[in-house]
Amino acid sequence: MSQILQHDAALVLFSGGQDSATCLAWTLSRFARVETLGFDYGQRHAVELDCRDRLIDGLKQIHPDWANKLGDAHTLSIPTLATISDTALTRDVAIAMGADGLPNTFVPGRNLLFLTFAAALAYRRGIGGLVGGMCETDYSGYPDCRDATLKALTTALNLGMATDFELHTPLMWRDKAATWALAQDLGGDALVDLIREHSHTCYLGERGARHDWGYGCGECPACQLRAKGWREYREAGTAT
C-alpha cells in the first residue's frame, strides 16, 4: 500500500439532497472523523449546494457530539461535466423518457467521476471510507447507481491507487420510505423535519413550492419519488 488510510474516517458525497443528508447522519453515527464533498457541475438544481450548511448546522444541534466529528466541507467545481453532457439536469430542456428507457436526467459517468474525485481527495486526506447515497431499489434506473457498478469501480480505484478504500452505500437496498424511516431511527422527528425542510431534491431547483414532504416542483421524477416515499413512510407510521 502506498498510502495508509484511517478506516475510522469517512468522506461523504454530500449534495444537500435527502439521500446524502441521511447518509451524512448515518456516517456520523458510525465514524470518528467525517468530511463532506459536494460537486458543482453546472446542474440546474445547484440550489442543493446551498442547503448543505443548514443541514450541517441542524445535525450539530440534533446530536451535539457529532459536531466534534465533522471536519472539512469540500466543494469541487467540474463544469466540464455539463459541457460534455446533453441532459435535462444540465440543459434547460423538458424532462422526458429516452428511447433507451432512461430519463433524460441521466448524466452519463456522473457517479463514476464523483467517486473517482472523492477517492483522490480521500487518498490525500488519509480517509479510508467513502459514503454515497446511491440506491437501486427506488430510483430512476441510472446504471451508475447499481451495486455491481459501484463494487467494480471500488475495485478499480483500489487497484489504480494501490490502497484499500471501503465504499459504503447505506441506502442501496432501501426504498424512499425506508430512507425516511432511517432518518427517524438516527435522529427522531428532529432529523426527519430537518431533512424535510432543508434538503433539496427537485431537479428543476424549485424552492418556492412547499409540500408536506418538502420543497419542489412536485412533477419531476425526483419529486415524485420523494413524495411517494414520504406518503408510504407516513402510512406505515400510522398503521403501527
Curated annotation (Swiss-Prot):
Classification via InterPro entries: QueC, Rossmann-like_a/b/a_fold
Membrane-spanning segments: none
Superkingdom of this protein's organism: Bacteria
GO molecular function terms noted in the UniProt entry: ATP binding; ligase activity, forming carbon-nitrogen bonds; zinc ion binding
Cofactor: Zn(2+)
Assigned keywords, A-Z: ATP-binding, Ligase, Metal-binding, Nucleotide-binding, Queuosine biosynthesis, Zinc
Annotated coiled-coil segments of the chain: none
EC number, UniProt record: 6.3.4.20
SUPFAM superfamilies hit by this protein: Adenine nucleotide alpha hydrolases-like (SSF52402)
Swiss-Prot/TrEMBL catalytic activity: 7-carboxy-7-deazaguanine + NH4(+) + ATP = 7-cyano-7-deazaguanine + ADP + phosphate + H2O + H(+)
One Gene Ontology term from the biological process aspect of the record: queuosine biosynthetic process
Role, per record: Catalyzes the ATP-dependent conversion of 7-carboxy-7-deazaguanine (CDG) to 7-cyano-7-deazaguanine (preQ(0)).
Protein family membership: Belongs to the QueC family.
PANTHER family, alphabetized: 7-CYANO-7-DEAZAGUANINE SYNTHASE (PTHR42914:SF1)
UniProt-recorded name of the protein: 7-cyano-7-deazaguanine synthase
Chain's gene name: queC
